[in-house]
Amino acid sequence: VKCLSELDEQSYLMESLGYLAKGEFGIPGRRYFQKGGVQRTHQVHAFLTGSHEAQRHIAFKEYLIAFPEVADEYGVLKKTGAAICNNDIDVYCRHKDSFIKEHEARALNWKFA
């Protein structure tokens, strides 16, 4: 997005679609929307265009597309995490953390080096 404050002013539009606006939710410069309550079904992340956080997330996504074997491994990791976390997002995130950090670093190097 071009302006976070404009997004904040219009977050009611996302809420009208059933999303809960959660603000930065742990990542400065991000706006996070979640749908489905405890058993989250959808999520939307919005960043300032060109920000480091946006580039980091896009690089990871593009890396997974370029390397389907890594995407498959990530998918298995996510399914395993969902099965063991008992809807505890902190447990789920810790389960994926080392994989994400390793492959995010590779993705940034792959995209920008």
Role assignments for model-derived ranges:
Residues 4-11, 15-113:
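Catalytic core of pol beta-like nucleotidyltransferases
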